[in-house]
From Swiss-Prot:
Enzyme superclass (EC): transferase
Keyword Transferase (UniProt): yes
Organism of origin: Buchnera aphidicola subsp. Baizongia pistaciae (strain Bp)
Protein name: Ribosomal RNA large subunit methyltransferase E
E.C. no: 2.1.1.166
Family per similarity comment: Belongs to the class I-like SAM-binding methyltransferase superfamily. RNA methyltransferase RlmE family.
GO molecular function: rRNA (uridine-2'-O-)-methyltransferase activity
Amino acid sequence: MSKKRSSSSNRWLNEHFKDKYVKQVHKNKSDIRSRAWFKLDDIQSSNNFLKVGMTVVDLGSSPGSWSGYAVKRVGKKGRVIACDMRPMLPIKDVVFFQGNIKNKCFFNFIETYLCHKKVHVIISDMAPNMTGHYFIDHIQAILLSKLALKMSIKVLSKGGSLLVKSFYGQEFNSFIQDVHVTFSKVKICKPNSSRARSREVYILASGRKM
């Protein structure tokens, strides 16, 4: 490992363990599985797009922070369906499927499972395994964002919403244009709990067109 990479890794570790959100995760492990919980909470607090009785699909759900948050918001009358290529410990009232959404067969399976259900919201915190090469990482991240958009086109009911992680970069504006085609309102969110120097943003698209 180069000195530059080692220095960068040490800086990240130092920031990670000093992070106030990470500290809160360690204090509330039974309720909050990762700092991603706070990102969804920030966005929900400002936009109130998750409501009682809704059906929510969580893409890239593991370790379960967003699913756990969503299931409390939709209540007993709602439902949460989650999927990830990694395993996820069970969460009460959350249906979980393990598989790679990039795999066409698994994507089609999820689509078929959802096609007769009225899906109100899709949330996606999917991100690729970062290589450290900016362009490669950006393209892989945008591909995952596009998969979430594709799923929303397939299964979201009229007026539904999509919350999807994305990253600023060369293909970002083109992706935003694609989102505008499907949704009447598109908002770019940078939660307080998202690290300031990160290119990570969240796109909240509402008013699914039919």
